[in-house]
């Protein structure tokens, strides 16, 4: 798309917008199937859509949001297969799951257990080899294609030192704490130990509810098609176990919050299915459970509402304002050479992308310093973009603040003349 239409901000976000529509489409279908009760359906939908951290990724030009949408679409197609036993739905489920991995390779942790469980379900529906092969052949051939396509990228990834060294998260609980911290934006709802308390509550709920689902699965003849909700519940613990095995076997660290993003939809499905089973067993008493979670979700999303920046890419908030300011400076001063700009190292990638790719031609007005890691602010460029005044204090004798970015601590400095 970028090759045809250029690297316009809307164009580079089209895949993730598709992911957002897929996510919403699949979420609506899955929640309608979970329960006959309207309020339970609405509750389940809010659990899938009410995480502000997850929602951010449907506006960022990254693969995480697209992967989440494809994953939920795969789960919806697997539900359809469990209900109808049609080979087309099984093949579609594997296609969506395979594409989810291509959007974000972390979803291999979803893909592997999903394929295993959906093929077990296919065998349960078609317990003779001839019937199983007839129903599963298109899906299995599709699976082989994806395995072949994924082999070389995975081989290359194994050579990347970041796979071994990035984040250094040494425990699964630590990984979950990072995810919870990202989801609540460090709001101390329960005091200083909010993150730890909420993480324990989430872990205990998921473990306990998985045990309940396992009991129900056993009572219903160990068949997923007896209640497709069992399949939805099983995916989260299966993915977590896969993650633990991967860490143990490969020595890689546990997942940082954005890499673990795909856990949130799976957790949301567990919360929704729990409400459906609770209502089924106890009727309106389920409102106690739903009211608490709905209240917290509404409170959290209202506290974390975010229309101006990304919590993951917080340093990108003022990029366009700085570029527009420098463009205006170039034009009003009648310059013929691009303006020299240096910046804190975390901001460099965003500027370099816009200068190299943005079709609006900012490279005519601005020349960026070569990429560098963390280093003290230098005096080599006419303009310096700092994260805060504290960072720039050692060069303030030679620079003036010409643009404080509203709503942030970022400042653009210019050499005194």
Predicted region positions:
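Membrane-proximal helix-loop-helix interfaces that form the catalytic/acceptor-binding platform
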Residues: 1-392, 398-413
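Short, solvent-exposed mixed-charge patches
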Residues: 416-417
């Amino acid at each position: 798309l970028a090759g045809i239409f250029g690297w316009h901000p809307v164009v580079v976000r089209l895949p993730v917008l598709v992911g957002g529509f897929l996510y919403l489409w699949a979420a609506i279908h899955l929640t309608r199937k979970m329960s006959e009760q309207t309020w339970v359906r609405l509750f389940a939908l809010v659990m899938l859509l009410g995480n502000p951290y997850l929602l951010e990724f449907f506006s960022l030009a990254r693969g995480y949001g697209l992967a989440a949408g494809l994953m939920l679409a795969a789960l919806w197609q697997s539900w359809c297969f469990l209900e109808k036993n049609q080979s087309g739905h099984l093949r579609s489920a594997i296609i969506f799951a395979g594409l989810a991995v291509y959007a974000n390779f972390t979803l291999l942790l979803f893909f592997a257990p999903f394929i295993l469980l959906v093929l077990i379900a296919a065998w349960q529906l078609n317990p003779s080899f001839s019937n199983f092969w007839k129903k599963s052949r298109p899906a299995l051939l599709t699976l082989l294609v994806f395995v072949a396509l994924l082999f070389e990228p995975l081989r290359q990834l194994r050579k990347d030192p970041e796979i071994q060294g990035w984040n250094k998260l040494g425990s699964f609980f630590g990984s979950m704490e990072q995810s919870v911290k990202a989801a609540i934006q460090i709001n101390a709802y329960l005091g200083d130990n909010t993150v730890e308390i909420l993480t324990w509550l989430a872990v205990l709920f998921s473990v306990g509810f998985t045990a309940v689902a396992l009991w129900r699965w056993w009572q219903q003849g160990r068949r997923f098609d007896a209640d497709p909700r069992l399949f939805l519940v099983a995916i989260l613990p299966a993915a977590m176990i896969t993650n633990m095995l991967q860490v143990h076997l490969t020595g890689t660290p546990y997942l940082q919050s954005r890499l673990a993003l795909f856990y949130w939809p799976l957790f949301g499905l567990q919360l929704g299915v729990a409400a459906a089973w609770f209502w089924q067993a106890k009727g309106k008493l389920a409102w106690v459970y739903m009211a608490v979670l709905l209240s917290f979700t509404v409170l959290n999303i209202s506290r974390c509402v975010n229309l101006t920046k990304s919590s993951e890419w917080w340093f990108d908030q003022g990029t366009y304002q700085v570029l527009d300011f420098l463009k205006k400076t170039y034009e009003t001063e009648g310059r013929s050479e691009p303006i020299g700009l240096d910046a804190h190292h975390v901001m460099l990638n965003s500027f370099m992308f816009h200068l190299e790719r943005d079709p609006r031609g900012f490279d005519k007005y601005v020349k960026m310093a070569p990429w560098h890691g963390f280093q003290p602010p230098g005096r080599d460029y006419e303009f310096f973009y700092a994260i805060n005044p504290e960072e720039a204090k050692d060069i303030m004798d030679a620079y003036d603040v010409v643009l404080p970015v509203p709503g942030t601590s970022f400042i653009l400095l210019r050499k005194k003349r």
